Each structure stands twice: as structure tokens, then as C-alpha cells.
């Protein structure tokens, strides 16, 4: 039976005891197999566990591996010029190096360089509301997990400088995870994971319906059906299914191929070698939290994408069947455990990804 260092509240309700661990409705707390008969001490109503103290060798490997993946982030904002944002970044990096690079990058780009010589771009994105001079999209270089803190610090400085980002101005957040290590099967797993959870994620993030209708649509049912029926064994076959099912078989190498406008964008996989998650946005500003930009929220989004990518690599298969809907908060919390987002390091992510959902996080069917 699994052992835990301590029990914390709020509790998690166990609904199956096994020889190797416990299983929770909607997700596994520990690696589980061979169900055993529950005793008086191990009956579901008598055993409660929490995500903070759930850690085994499998989860530790999961967390270790998710941190090895590469990251790219795009943050759309306004109320700050691209030149000013680039100067702020250059000062933040301590290099003082920033310049106008539109002749090379297009999009009226201003670039800043960090101490490692990496180029951080601030580009014009016409989909953002506001005057043209202040339509600004931050495009990071390829980052590693340990660079997240640097990105967070930059986001805080941009916010303090007046930059604003939220769905009300047409601004979103796109996160790229390096596709290295993925196969047609693991990408199929990822597509099914998104198909089965994207409604839950959309509710958790309160994704703007206008963005969902245009720029971050849900997974195309025809794509999922063809993907699971044909079971591609190479990337060329996978690409054929992606583009044809999405009605975008033209211009596969074009940046603005229409297939890209999905929460999960595999067009980036075939053109950039990344998996793009386009669904994120910052909360609408309030009196307490101005300008929308939030470093903790951004880190939570990155961690979720890393965990999704890593889980897809570790599964033999995944189902596109939607999750239970009678208790969304419980469904999300147990899923985050399966993703490996346990312990203090991921507590902020768990909070951001469950706080907007209805239901009881500890009891699937109520107390």
C-alpha cells in the first residue's frame, strides 16, 4: 500500500484500494493494479489523501522528464510600444542591447538580447486592439524550465511599465513545447488527451468565446475520428490527416495556414518542430490585479503544457472520451494529479486551474 509522509486538508477521497496503491475517481494517485478487497481501515470513506504528499518513483520521473522539454512563449499585449518593451527587456537582461530588426524579422519587430545572446522579439500583431504603435507581441527564444523565472520577472516589469494583456483587447498567450521525443502515436495520445479535457480546460480558464470561435478552436471531431481510425505510423501520414481533416490542405508550409487556429496546433509541429497550445489568456484586470499580466498564471500555463506533452509520451493509448461533468473541480484536480502536478512546486498551477470550476475538489459526489 502507498505510504505518505503526512495527511493534509482538504482531503482526497479514495474509491479503490489496490495492492500497489490507491485509485481516485477520475485519476490515479499512485500506480495501481490488482484491486483488493477493502478492509474496515481501507474503505473509501475512511481513507483521504491530498496531492501535496502524493509522490512515488513514477511521478518523480514524470516531473523530471517534463522539465527537460524546451519552451517557447508568445504573449500579446498593448499599452506599450515595441521599442519601449525591447529597451525594458534589454535593461532587465543587463545587456542594454536592443534594436529595430524589422528588415530581418518583419512585423515591425524590435529585438532585445539577453546575456546568453538569445533574441527576444517584440512584434506587431494586428489582431490586438489599440493603436498600431502599441500592438505588441513578445516572442521568446527557445527556453528551458530554469528560464521560467527570468520570463516571469520580465512579465512583471512589463506590467509595471503599463503593458496590458487580456481577452478583452484580443490578447492571448501561446505556449510552444518542443516536439522532440514525440512520435505519431504520442501525438495521437496528446490529441486525444486534449479532446477529452478541452471543455474542462476552457471552463477552468474562462476562455473568451470569441477567441474559441476563431483563434483557438476545439479539436476538430473529423480529425480525431480519422486519426484514431487510421492510426498513422509516420509523420507524413499524421500530417495528411491533420491538414485534410481541417480543410487546410493548401499551403502547408505557410505560416497562416488555417489549421493553426486550434487550441492544440499541430501545424507548428510540421513547420517549426513545436507543439503549440493557443488557448491561454490572462484574467481580466481588476482593482486588485491590474493590467491582466500575471507571472504566476503564466508559469501555471507553461507547467500544464509541459505535463500534457510528457503524459502523452508515457501513455500507450489515450481515449478522446470527455471526462465526467457532474463535478468539474474534482475532475480537474484528479487529472492534475495524473499529470504529475503534485507537491508545493505546482500548488499555484493547481489553484489557477481549479479555482473557476464548480463542484467539490475533495468529493466527486458531494459530502
Language model feature labels by segment:
Residues 16, 24, 33:
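Cysteine-centered metal-binding/redox modules
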Residues 3, 7, 14-18, 45-51:
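Short, positively charged and aromatic/hydrophobic N-terminal segments
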Residues 169-177:
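Short, conserved phosphate-binding/catalytic loop or strand-edge motifs used
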Residues 35-54:
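Short, Lys/Arg-enriched N-terminal segments with co-localized hydrophobic residues
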Residues 7-8, 29:
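Leucine-biased recognition of intrinsically disordered, low-complexity hydrophobic segments
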Residues 21, 26-27:
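Residue-identity detector for glycine
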Residues 51-167, 180-367:
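C-terminal accessory/tail domains of diverse enzymes
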